[in-house]
């Protein structure tokens, strides 16, 4: 799979919210304290990382986008440490200093990759005059493509409704990572990104995906939202929009070490991708990939462009270009936006041979992207008989995905890929063999959409059936 990432360097995003400093003390533990039944940690490493809204801004800047951060801090060492750390990663800070309050700081003590305790140093900023925050937002609205409001219920977003209205008047999308159960505060936002627990705290326990969709759509209507993205941990994330089918994306996480800051990564990547001119569906695709990376790291973390590109491309153990149908639709939409011609073909591809490779290479030359749709094992049995397939679906898709000519591989359960093709609507539908174009599944739908249908020849003498027969004859001999 060959992926072109968004042009993040042209994206401008402002983050407003509760900024904090995350401190980490690391060290070995080898004994219990004589003073109390607690472990003694010999601290040998100290780290300081921006957290809360500051971590969102770091995630945006790490992709190469222009990130501006506005929030409330004290006048203390923590505020200075925050400013320095953020300046080092190209985040432009414009803090409002409140001399009567400390900068929010969270100290974590860790040993052997385990967090032993967290200590919080904070006083809420409720009651602080929000006007300086409003002024900073107003000054930036003409030069940003998205506004992120990062709510940790520490007081910086006490006037969140006024902030939403400022952005709406300027036509700037507002993305909010909500806190608490009072979603009335966020009325009129472009997108809310609650996790499943936060979502269920508002709408009630959801036993099925259908309930998530039904209650999510009601929440969108009740609070005049443009969209809702529910992050669902190991079950991925679900994007809901009025008038559109729900988009459920499976998680891409391989290992989960720490979910700290994962929500910051999701909303940060969403905002940067939107501000770069991409659709919400495309933004969710990138955010889902980024979340899969960041939960594999310890502590609040960011995702680099290279890490994101590798995650989007897929890892070797998932078969490179192997995709779900929903992921494929997003990839095709992104390709079309870049003006690329999408070619699609299908088949069983049971025992891959020279004829297959030559055919796929020729098909790829006809466009910019090649999709290969593969019959599932059950579909293959119905088509070829009980002795087939020789190779199970997963192996067939992995081999196809490894070919240079192939961009994306997807499976289908039906006898023909007509439904799948109708959903993708490639620019060019290709089939190998001696078919007539009108006999090819999906041809009518492609033609109706203004696309083309073409029949290509296989190499003479190359067929899976002939290979199987030869193997059987050799065994008898």
Swiss-Prot record:
EC number of the protein: 2.7.1.167, 2.7.7.70
A Pfam family this chain is assigned to: PfkB
Role played: Catalyzes the ADP transfer from ATP to D-glycero-beta-D-manno-heptose 1-phosphate, yielding ADP-D-glycero-beta-D-manno-heptose.
Catalytically driven reaction(s): D-glycero-beta-D-manno-heptose 7-phosphate + ATP = D-glycero-beta-D-manno-heptose 1,7-bisphosphate + ADP + H(+); D-glycero-beta-D-manno-heptose 1-phosphate + ATP + H(+) = ADP-D-glycero-beta-D-manno-heptose + diphosphate
Residues with the N6-acetyllysine modification: 179
Cellular component annotations (GO), alphabetically ordered: cytosol
Protein name per Swiss-Prot or TrEMBL: Bifunctional protein HldE
Secretion signal, residue range per the UniProt entry: none
Region (Ribokinase): 1-318
Kinase recorded as keyword: yes
Organism expressing this protein natively: Shigella boydii serotype 18 (strain CDC 3083-94 / BS512)
């Amino acid at each position: 799979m060959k992926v072109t990432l968004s042009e993040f360097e042209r994206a401008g995003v402002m983050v407003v919210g509760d900024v904090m400093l995350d401190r980490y003390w690391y060290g070995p533990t080898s004994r219990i304290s004589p003073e109390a039944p607690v472990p003694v940690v010999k601290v040998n490493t100290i780290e300081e990382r921006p957290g809360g809204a500051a971590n969102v801004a770091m995630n945006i800047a790490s992709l190469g986008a222009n990130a501006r951060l506005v929030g409330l801090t004290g006048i203390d060492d923590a505020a200075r440490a925050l400013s320095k750390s953020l300046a080092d990663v190209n985040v432009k800070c414009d803090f409002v200093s409140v001399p009567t309050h400390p900068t929010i700081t969270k100290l974590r003590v860790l040993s052997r990759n385990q967090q032993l305790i967290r200590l919080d140093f904070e006083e809420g900023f409720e009651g602080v005059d929000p006007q300086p925050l409003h002024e900073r937002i107003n000054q930036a609205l003409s030069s940003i493509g998205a506004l992120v409001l990062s709510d940790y219920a520490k007081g910086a977003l006490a006037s969140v409704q006024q902030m939403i209205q400022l952005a709406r008047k300027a036509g700037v999308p507002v993305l909010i990572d909500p806190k608490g159960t009072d979603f009335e505060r966020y009325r009129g936002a472009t997108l809310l990104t609650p996790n499943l627990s936060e979502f269920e705290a508002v709408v009630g326990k959801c036993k099925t995906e259908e309930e998530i969709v039904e209650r999510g759509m009601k929440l969108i209507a009740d609070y005049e939202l443009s969209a809702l993205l529910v992050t669902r941990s190991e079950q991925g994330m679900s994007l809901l929009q009025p008038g559109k089918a729900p988009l459920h994306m499976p998680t891409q996480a391989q290992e989960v070490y720490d979910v700290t800051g994962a929500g910051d990564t999701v909303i940060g990547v969403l905002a940067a991708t939107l501000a770069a001119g991409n659709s919400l569906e495309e933004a969710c695709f990138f955010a889902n990939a980024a979340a899969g990376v960041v939960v594999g790291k310890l502590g609040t973390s960011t995702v680099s462009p290279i890490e994101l590109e590798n995650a989007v491309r897929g890892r070797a153990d998932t078969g490179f270009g192997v995709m779900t149908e929903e992921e494929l639709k997003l990839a095709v939409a992104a390709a079309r936006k870049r003006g690329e011609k999408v070619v699609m073909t299908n088949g069983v591809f049971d025992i891959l041979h020279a004829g297959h490779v030559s055919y796929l290479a020729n098909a790829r030359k006809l466009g910019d992207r090649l999709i290969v749709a593969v019959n599932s094992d059950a579909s293959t049995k119905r088509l070829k008989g009980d002795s087939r397939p020789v190779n199970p679906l997963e192996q067939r898709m992995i081999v196809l995905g490894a070919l240079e000519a192939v961009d994306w591989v997807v499976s289908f359960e039906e006898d023909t890929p007509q439904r799948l093709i109708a959903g993708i609507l490639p620019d060019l539908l290709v089939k190998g063999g001696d078919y007539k174009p009108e006999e090819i599944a999906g041809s009518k739908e492609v033609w109706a959409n203004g696309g083309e249908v073409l029949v290509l020849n296989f190499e003479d003498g190359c067929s899976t059936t002939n290979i199987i027969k030869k193997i059987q004859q050799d065994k008898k001999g």
